[in-house]
Amino acid sequence: MTLFLLKHLLKNIFLRTMNIIAQTARLLIRELTPEDERLLLDLDADARLTRYVKKRTEQESKKVFKDTLRDYQKKTGMGRWGIFNLADNDFVGVCILDYSEFDRNSIELGYRLHLKYWGSGIATELAQAIVSYGLNEIGLKEICAVTHPENKASQKVLFKAGFQPHGRAFWHGDDLPFFKVSRSTF
């Protein structure tokens, strides 16, 4: 067996054991493991990253993490995943593709990245990969997203990932821009 084939085989075995959702040029998106809990807790504790979303207590974050691990057993193809830098395995953030909290009939994309990755194109790369995964791999008809009205950077990411404005959504008392992307327009 050549060295190339051996490396390819080992990489595929590694990816399957890590429950990889998607891989891009710079990112590895995978299911979280029990050892990743501190990563999510630290992300949720950073006030700079929760400026546009509801802040969680540490106990709430621990419950979200526990529920996330439990939900993987459902094998729906959806969930909350860790985002890791492919070059050095640095934790970039989290993303979610799951039933929306504001409309249980919709599947929503969400993401939160560490500050050092803002402005690098990582969010767009991530959003495009997850939209492609949702529409092409698990066969969703459409995916929605909401942003805080002042979060113009996230709105730009959504446009670059193929989303279009689709009215407003009301969530936790906030009136939010609502976006959708469908298989027919992606």
Residue ranges with predicted function:
Residues 15-16, 67-69:
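A generic local structural motif
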Residues 48-68:
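Conserved GNAT-fold acetyl-CoA-binding loop/helix
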Residues 56-60, 79, 150:
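Short, conserved alpha-helical segments within structured domains
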Residues 69-82:
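A short helix-loop-beta-strand connector motif used in the catalytic cores of GNAT acetyltransferases and
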